[in-house]
Amino acid sequence: MQKFIVKITSENISLIDDSRVECFLLDSAADTAFNRRFAEAARKAGKLLLSCGDKAPELCRELGLDGVVVDLSKNEKPKAEFQFLRNFLGKDAVIGAVTRNRRHEAMVISEFEPDFLVFQAWNDGIEQVRELVSWYNGLFLIQSAILCREENLDYAGFDCDIVILSDREYTI
């Protein structure tokens, strides 16, 4: 059964009480005061908290979050970036790594041993992404995730461990 990471896109703390959501993703570009309030409330409820965005490592460290989801898909030196994150955040931090939707890149990023590998999914080309995720899960022990980049994406048909949705899309 898929687990959900819900990306918080608006100042809404009501999802913290949803027992089906175990992990939240805070955007480093969002208001820091809100991120701090949300993190405190989510921590009290026993939820995991990750950060994303350009300043994800800094936000993670500042607020004492559990880890980050970092986009390595555009990075020409992903190993150096990943090693920086591991050193900056510590060995116990959770790191989810977004990869390009290609087998070679998925294998390369997996060599760094992230906690989970994130594939990006759009409605256009969804079948190719489904096939890629299925192939990946057949070969690797690292958990896989899909990051829904569009609304109304049929994520239920993915053979993945984790689905990352925005708070607008999470309506289960």
Locate the predicted segments by residue.
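A short, hydrophobic beta-strand element within the central beta-sheet of small alpha/beta folds
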Residues: 140-142
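Charged helix-capping and loop-helix junction motifs
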Residues: 124-131
